[in-house]
Structure formats: C-alpha cells, structure tokens
C-alpha cells in the first residue's frame, strides 16, 4: 500500500517520541551506556509496471518516440515507482487495435491519433484535427485553455478511457502522388490512403479513400495498391523512403493542419493511481506534447531540402480551385455530422467558435507577420 499522509504523520510522531525520551535521559544524567533502539519500519511505496501499446512502428521518429519519452520521464520523475514498457504497432496489438486494448483493460496505456476512432466515437476526430481546422498552437490552446480537454474526456468516458494530449506533428503535407493533380478531374478514381474527415472529403470529390497503418504504406504505394498517400511531413516521409515510390509531393496539408497525438489510459487503472503518479504522468505528457512539436518544426526543414535537392522530388502546390472545393466539401461534412450527433455538435460548436476567435487575432498578428517576413 502506498504511504499516505496518515502514515507520514505517524513516522514524524514516533521520531519526536524517541528524541524526547533521549533528551529526558540526558537531562537526568543517565546518558552513560544508553542504547536507544530506533527500529521503525517505513512502509514502501507500491510500484507499478504498465504496458503501453502504440499505433506507430517501434521507435519511429517523432510519432513513435513520443510514448518512449513519456515512459522514460515517468520512470525518472517517480524514482522508479512506475515503469512503462512501450510496444510498437503489431508487437502486441495491431495499430488500429490500440483503442480497444486500452478500453478493455488488456493494456493500461496507448498512444495514437483520435481520428482513427471515428467509427467508435465520431467526435474523436476533433482532438487530432479536422480539415481547414486549428493549427498546432491553436489546438493546444483550445484543448488546454478553451474547454477542449473537458469535452475530449467526456467523449472518451463511455469507453473507459482517460485521454491526455501527447504530441503534435504541426501542419502536414498533403502527400505523395504518382500522377499530377491539375484539376478536380484528376481526383476522380484516385486511390489514396487518407484517414478521418480528409478521407470523406476525398470520397465526395470522386476519390477512393483507403485506410492503412503506416508500416504498410511504402509497399502499397510502390506496388500500385494505392495511387497516393498522405503520412506526416518531410521528416517522417523521408524515413519511410516515399521518394523512392512516388514522384510528386503535394502541399498544403489542408486535411491535417496541426495533428495532436493522444496518450490513452484505462480509466479504472487511472483512478487507482496515487495522486503523485497522476501528476507525474500529466506533467510528462505535457512536456512531450511540446517536445514533439519542436522536433517536427526543426527536422522538417532539413528533410524537405534533402528530398528536393538530393532525391529530386517535385514539390507541387495543389491548384487553388481544388483547395477551394475541398474546403466547401469539408465544411458541408462537418455541418452534416454535427446535425446527426448531439455529442459531435457539442464538440464542433466549441471547436468552431474557438477557431473563429483565434483566427481573427492571427490575421493581424502571426499571419500578417509571416506575410511581411516572406515578402
């Protein structure tokens, strides 16, 4: 049993009693040959060994390192009271089995992206990101200061899961293509790996969205199972070698403007933890949430230069009319989904309101500054 405030108080009282006895004996002149036995047993803190399953390949840069860093920080800050063993996708459960594993309690923790679970909890997509939505800084602000976190935990509560923000990729690229996209006609019949609402947008535009875990993407693209794939951005895309399987690299990543990653914890296991470990886990996740964003911001620049300058990748911008049509479709889908589901609507209204408010300020601050800087 973990040492609580009561047992600590008892320790202090026992120490004082022994010291008072010793002082009285010394004062009374009975100090010679006095042996005072101080034989108090201090309760040992209960230790915890948890398993964490992820939707990413083991030790994969950025995505896969986020849970590893959380595990290391928790063990260090708890002085070994908690040890978390991290398993990559497929080692114990499939990439898309993480949510169920944590929900059922077969594993205490998981690390993934909320949009993978749209079939279970449609509102979960907002906590990764939605097309033309919040950037990394904005979704962090909405989650931590705008009521998003409370909504997130409300959405996951029926599944016995306690979510914590745990990483962000920043704005992504649209993806890798084996044919040029010059108009909306080029989207028709296009088989592309793209999850979440982005996949729904592609489908309405005439494309064929495909769901595949990261570890299968290179082979699927190289063999023609799919015509295109989105993944993350230059840093991660370079490590998968997509430049060897596709010629064109399209931007902007309208579908994932600031993708937040999630640490999932079984609610029963979380409730049973002592307060100190809860604080340690929350603190570690918050530190890694920013650390991963910093890593992507720093590494994407170098990786993009290498893709273009060394590997000869053709960097292409999506035509304006294609982007405009995607935006119209995305807005329609968000509104329709909100109209069909009370929980989705509740989250959507909060997300939408925050985006409108933060966008108004960013137009005259960050957006205006970046435009001036790049002129």
Each language-model region and where it sits:
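A gly/proline- and charged-residue-enriched helix-loop-helix capping module
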Residues: 137-153
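Sec-dependent signal peptide recognition
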Residues: 15-23
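Short, Lys/Arg-enriched N-terminal segments with co-localized hydrophobic residues
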Residues: 1-13
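Short, solvent-exposed secondary-structure boundary motifs
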Residues: 5, 151-156
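N-terminal secretory/targeting leader peptides
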Residues: 30-139, 156-157, 162-375
């Amino acid at each position: 049993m973990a040492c609580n405030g009561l047992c600590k108080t008892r320790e202090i009282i026992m120490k004082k009693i022994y010291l008072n006895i010793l002082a009285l004996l010394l004062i009374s002149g009975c100090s010679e040959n006095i042996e005072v036995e101080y034989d108090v047993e201090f309760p040992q803190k209960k230790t915890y060994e948890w398993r964490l399953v992820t939707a990413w390949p083991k030790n994969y840069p950025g995505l896969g390192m986020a849970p590893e860093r959380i595990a290391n920080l928790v063990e260090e800050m708890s002085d070994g009271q908690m040890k978390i063993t991290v398993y990559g996708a497929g080692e114990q459960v499939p990439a898309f089995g993480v949510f169920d594993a944590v929900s059922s309690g077969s594993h205490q923790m998981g690390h993934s992206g909320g949009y993978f679970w749209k079939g279970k909890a449609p509102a979960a997509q907002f906590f990764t990101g939605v097309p033309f939505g919040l950037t990394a800084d904005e979704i962090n602000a909405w989650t931590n200061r705008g009521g998003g976190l409370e909504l997130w935990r409300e959405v996951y509560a029926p599944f016995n899961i306690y979510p914590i923000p745990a990483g962000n990729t920043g704005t992504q690229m649209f993806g890798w293509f084996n044919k040029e996209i010059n108009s909306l006609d080029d989207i028709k019949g296009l088989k592309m790996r793209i999850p979440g609402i982005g996949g729904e947008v592609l489908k309405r535009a005439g494309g064929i969205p495909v769901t595949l875990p990261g570890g299968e993407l290179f082979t699927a693209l190289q063999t023609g199972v799919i015509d295109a794939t989105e993944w993350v951005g230059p840093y991660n895309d370079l490590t998968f070698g997509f430049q060897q399987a596709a010629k064109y690299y399209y931007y902007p990543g309208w579908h994932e403007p600031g993708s937040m990653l999630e640490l999932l914890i079984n609610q029963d296991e979380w409730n049973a933890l002592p307060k100190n470990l809860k604080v340690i886990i929350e603190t570690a996740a918050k530190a890694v949430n920013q650390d991963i964003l910093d890593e992507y911001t720093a590494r994407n620049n170098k990786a993009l230069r290498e893709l273009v300058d060394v590997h000869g990748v053709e960097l292409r911008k999506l035509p304006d009319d294609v982007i405009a049509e995607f935006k119209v479709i995305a807005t329609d889908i968000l509104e329709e989904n909100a109209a069909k589901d009370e929980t989705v609507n509740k989250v959507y209204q909060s997300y939408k309101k925050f985006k409108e408010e933060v966008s108004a300020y960013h137009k005259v601050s960050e957006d205006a500054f970046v435009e001036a800087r790049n002129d």
